[in-house]
Amino acid sequence: MSDAALMTLVRTIVTADDTVAFHLLAANPALAKARFEIGVTRQTAETYYMDEIGHYVYAGDTALHVAAAAYRQKIVPKLIAMGANVRARNRRGAEPLHYAVDGRPGACRWNPPAQAATVARLIEAGADPNATDKSGVTPLHRAVRTRCAAAVKALLEAGADPRHENNSGSTPMLLATQNTGRGGSGSSEAKAQQELIVQLLREHLNRQI
């Protein structure tokens, strides 16, 4: 399947056009399981960037990756019901759950309740809260780095390991106490989220002692 057909679907997903997305899936059910064959390259950066979710589309990404990143609560279960692989890894090793925990506190598209619900739905369907990408990064690392406390809470409740070190030796707690360099991480909303994340991690770690 060409990237073009899948791109048409994911464009409708990020713009929240559920009616058209459902129509495309009904007309071509294979799209639910399809993966991008090429994805972003240096020459195609503009084509494969999804501004609505702040993500590039990489080779190996699926519609579920994009729906998870957009917290689409109708599309995510639909794709899963149609056979989408919740453990699908893109060329960087990221699974849909890695995308679901990303966010930008204070941005107009940021929706903590929808994000937490998306995380829970993916885990219910078999996603691993301790899955690692090629950099050893877990969903918890990403949720902490992007200052998404609701996602952190959902992951911890599902068994995410706050002591796991990525390939650089960083644990989620270390990332929680540092400036991540992520765009928007210095905003007042992000700082409030950071304080809540540190509290969540400390409480979780204390219960494990």
Language model features with spans:
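Ankyrin-repeat-protein effector appendages
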Residues: 1-11, 112-113, 125, 158, ...
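Ankyrin-repeat boundary/"N-cap" motif
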Residues: 3-11, 34-63, 89-106, 132-138, ...
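Ankyrin repeat A-helix N-terminal signature
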Residues: 12-17, 54, 66-72, 99-115, ...
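Internal alpha-helical scaffold/solenoid segments in large eukaryotic proteins
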Residues: 73, 83, 139-152, 157
